[in-house]
Regions:
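Cofactor-cradling patches in redox/metallo enzymes
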Residues: 2-7, 14-84
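Active-site loops and adjacent core secondary-structure elements that bind or stabilize anionic groups
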Residues: 96-167
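Active-site lining segments that contact anionic ligands and/or coordinate catalytic metals
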Residues: 33-36, 62, 86, 145, ...
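Conserved RecA-like helicase motor-core motifs
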Residues: 11-14, 90-91
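Phosphate/diphosphate-binding loops
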Residues: 42-54, 58-67, 71-72, 79, ...
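C-terminal accessory/binding modules appended to enzymatic or scaffolding proteins
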Residues: 1-10, 161, 166
Length: 167
């Protein structure tokens, strides 16, 4: 991500991997960051991204946050990270899209892009809420139950019944 942004004319302050949240907040403030990018390759990174978003909010930082990496998703970004941060939080699937998004946010489309993002994220959160709250009436659940005709199934009998002791 850093190389792609640098090749597109952006100054990048690369803090490396496994960077503590406090250091990210300090760097964002010290450099007056226009954008902040977080990338996660493993599942624990998702919790750390939430912590960073919360810490940035508490420090009063509102720069757009770009979320990417193998374990991330638009749904997780909308449902878990964005609510913890006052600035816009974008899920970026492809690292090559970071400079495109950054340029869009630097231009006349900034407010429109942020408004669209917030609308889409609200839609995702509402869909997730509906799916989490969805339950079937008992009659429908019984209608959908698994039906197995055991008389037609070939069951394999064990070759030995009882207890065996191995030395």
């Amino acid at each position: 991500v850093a190389v792609i942004l640098a090749c597109n004319g952006f100054e990048v302050i690369d803090l490396g991997v496994m960077t503590p949240s406090e250091r990210i907040v300090e760097a964002a403030i010290a450099h007056n960051a226009d954008y902040i990018g977080l990338s996660g390759l493993i599942t624990p990174s998702l919790d750390e991204m939430c912590r960073v978003a919360r810490d940035l909010r508490e420090a009063g930082v509102r720069a757009p946050l770009f979320i990417g990496g193998a374990t991330t998703s638009a749904l997780h970004t909308a449902a878990k990270i964005a609510p913890l941060y006052d600035g816009p939080v974008f899920h970026v699937k492809d690292a090559a899209q970071n400079p495109v998004l950054a340029m869009r946010l630097a231009g006349d489309e900034r407010e429109r892009a942020i408004a669209c993002l917030r609308f889409e994220q609200e839609q995702l959160r509402q869909r997730m809420q509906r799916e989490e709250n969805a339950s079937l009436p008992a009659s429908e659940a019984l209608r959908r139950k698994l039906h197995i005709d055991w008389s037609k199934e070939r069951l394999v009998a064990p070759t030995y019944e009882g207890v065996r002791i191995f030395d």
